[in-house]
C-alpha cells in the first residue's frame, strides 16, 4: 500500500476549507419554523438566534397555554431545520470531494 502523507495533508486541508465555508454559510442562513398550520412562525439564524416571531391574529383570542405550545413547537421546528442543514451526510460529501475515502457506514460523532 502506497501512503502519500503530502496528498493526505492536502486532502485534509481542502476538506477543512470546505467545512469552514459550510459553517459560514450556515451562520448566514435563516430558516422559518412553523406550527399550527402556519399560524405561528419563528425566523431563526444558523446561530440559533430568533429574529422574528409571527402570530396570526386569529390566535390572539385563544387561550394562553395553547399559544405558548404553538410558539414552542415553531421554535423547535426552526432548531431542527438548522440542525438538518449540517448533517453528517454533508460532511461525508465534503470528504469525498476532497478525495478522502471514508469506510462504508462511517458516521461522524456530531449531528
Swiss-Prot record:
Subunit structure, as described in the record: Homodimer.
Key words, A-Z: Cytoplasm, DNA-binding
Location of this chain's protein in the cell: Cytoplasm, Nucleoid
Protein name (record): Nucleoid-associated protein Fphi_0115
Family recorded in the similarity comment: Belongs to the YbaB/EbfC family.
Purpose: Binds to DNA and alters its conformation. May be involved in regulation of gene expression, nucleoid organization and DNA protection.
NCBIfam families: DNA_YbaB_EbfC
Main location: cytoplasm
Entry annotated with the keyword Repeat: no
Ranges of Basic and acidic residues composition bias in the record: 17-27
Pfam families: YbaB_DNA_bd (PF02575)
InterPro entries, A to Z: YbaB-like_sf (IPR036894), YbaB/EbfC (IPR004401)
Protein origin, superkingdom: Bacteria
SUPFAM superfamilies, A to Z: YbaB-like
Signal peptide extent: none
Any Gene Ontology CC annotation: bacterial nucleoid
GO function term, MF aspect, one: DNA binding
Organism the protein comes from: Francisella philomiragia subsp. philomiragia (strain ATCC 25017 / CCUG 19701 / FSC 153 / O#319-036)
Keyword tRNA processing belongs to the record: no
Record lineage: Bacteria, Pseudomonadati, Pseudomonadota, Gammaproteobacteria, Thiotrichales
Region annotation (Disordered) ranges: 1-27
